[in-house]
């Protein structure tokens, strides 16, 4: 097998995406009777302190040359690898069959998965053809209940908690974009020590290793698929491939990730241009795209019709695709257009209203989107350089004043007193106060947990990485983290 990777067409992202094959690739060999790729779907339709009903749906494929009697044995093991439930099903399989086997098991006195005690069960699926074992497949399971409530916020296992999350790009600072599980684990350890309990995967499906760590360490994940749909943000970005690939990519994303207990919501897009009716959005350069993303406030509302737009219909389509594959979790999107002219919000399809920034618009949610839970899907965008403090400490710096204004400062540094932020953002203190004091806000995902390579706001070259992180590229904490 030979794979050629070409990343020469630039820019294709608004941050550093990395080059080459930077995640693990697995070549799996199987017997003629096997569990299909991402072939299990494990849910817990009924959960109480006394018992948990576990529904296991398994897709099994046969490439055998003759019909066989197939035994499907499913075992649930607890965190100590003790068997706590088992069930077997027998069915005839013919050559070429692809069958879905449904089973229900019960766990007595289940240990709940939580932020403080992320207990993991393992669902083991064993296949036997005419008495000979042909496959063994493992699926993670976390027993928990959760709810996003429009009035009272987020509940996990009946307990009200605030999601105190951060957004994370996939690079690892000086290590680059290549996956390194221990480096990811170190990042999560630093975040957890700081009090973080949530991760938003900005703005693409994450490495599977990240989700495995979040399962094990107890993080509340918002799993995001797209940064753009049909309308582009950079010259060579995913919009070139959206029409051909979005159905396959979204399907694969949900199938791959839906068994992770750390995932509590899906996001189908981040600040996509389809929020607005902008005919020229396909011809924007990166500076104009950022301007439109963060400062669009002059749309003629008379252009909005009473019927659903193509962009609203596309929103409904994407949400329905997710729901068909995983009806157990809510779907949201990161919206930086908070008014009711937003085509994604007009669709009515989003289960959770997610606002990127616009702190002063939070209180409008209950009026403009009644009955919908709310989360601050992206917040703050404060700027800081470790060890650099500009006096006086109670002064405020908004850098730059607007995206369409040039900005220079010879220090190439931002004050770390939590008194410097971008014009569409806010300080950490102001943001957290708003979230903490309002029960209806389920939580927040701060931009960003760690600094990342690329998008060196507010400076241009020779700056080469962001200033947004609560933690810098080396993993050192800034003033705002303590």
What is the predicted function of each stretch?
Residues 4, 164, 201-202, 224, ...:
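Generic beta-strand/beta-sheet core signal
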Residues 170-171, 206, 230, 276-277, ...:
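Conserved protein kinase catalytic core
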């Amino acid at each position: 097998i030979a794979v050629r990777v070409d990343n020469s067409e630039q820019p294709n992202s608004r941050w550093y995406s990395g080059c080459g094959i930077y995640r693990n690739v697995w070549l799996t060999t199987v017997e003629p009777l096997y569990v299909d790729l991402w072939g299990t779907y494990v849910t817990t339709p009924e959960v109480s302190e006394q018992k948990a009903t576990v529904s296991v749906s398994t897709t099994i494929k046969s490439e055998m040359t003759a019909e066989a009697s197939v035994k499907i044995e499913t075992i649930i093991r607890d965190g100590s690898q003790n068997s706590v439930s088992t069930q077997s099903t027998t069915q005839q399989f013919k050559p070429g069959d692809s069958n879905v086997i449904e089973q229900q098991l019960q766990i007595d006195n289940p240990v709940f998965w939580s932020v403080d005690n992320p207990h993991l069960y393992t669902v083991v699926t064993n296949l036997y053809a005419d008495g000979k074992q042909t496959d063994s497949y493992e699926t993670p399971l976390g027993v928990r209940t959760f709810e996003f409530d429009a009035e009272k916020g987020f509940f996990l296992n009946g307990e009200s908690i605030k999601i105190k999350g951060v957004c994370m790009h996939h690079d690892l600072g000086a290590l680059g974009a290549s996956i390194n599980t221990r480096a990811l684990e170190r990042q999560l350890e630093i975040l957890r020590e700081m009090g973080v309990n949530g991760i938003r995967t900005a703005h693409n499906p994450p490495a599977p290793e990240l989700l495995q760590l979040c399962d094990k360490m107890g993080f509340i994940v918002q799993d995001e698929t797209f940064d753009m749909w049909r309308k582009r943000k950079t010259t060579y970005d995913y919009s070139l491939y959206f029409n051909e690939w979005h159905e396959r990519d979204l399907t694969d994303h949900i199938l791959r990730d839906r068994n992770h207990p750390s995932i509590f919501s899906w996001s189908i897009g981040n600040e996509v241009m389809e929020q607005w009716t902008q005919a020229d959005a396909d011809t924007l350069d990166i500076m104009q795209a950022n301007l439109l993303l963060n400062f669009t406030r002059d749309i003629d509302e008379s252009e909005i019709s009473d019927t659903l737009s193509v962009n609203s219909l596309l929103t409904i389509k994407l949400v329905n695709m997710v729901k068909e594959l995983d009806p157990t979790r809510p779907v949201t999107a990161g919206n930086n257009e908070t008014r009711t002219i937003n085509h994604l919000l007009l669709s009515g399809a989003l289960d959770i209203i997610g606002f990127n920034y616009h702190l002063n618009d939070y209180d409008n949610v209950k009026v403009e989107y009644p009955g919908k839970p709310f989360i601050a899907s992206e917040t703050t965008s404060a700027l800081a350089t470790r060890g650099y403090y500009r006096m006086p400490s109670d002064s405020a710096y908004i850098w730059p004043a607007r995206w369409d204004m040039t900005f220079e400062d010879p220090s190439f540094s931002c004050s770390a007193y939590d008194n410097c932020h971008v014009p569409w953002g806010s300080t950490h203190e102001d943001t957290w106060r708003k979230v903490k004091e309002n029960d209806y806000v389920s939580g927040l995902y701060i931009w960003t947990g760690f600094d990342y390579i690329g998008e060196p706001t507010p400076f241009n070259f020779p700056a080469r990485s962001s200033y947004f992180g609560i933690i810098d590229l080396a993993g050192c904490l800034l003033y705002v983290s303590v």
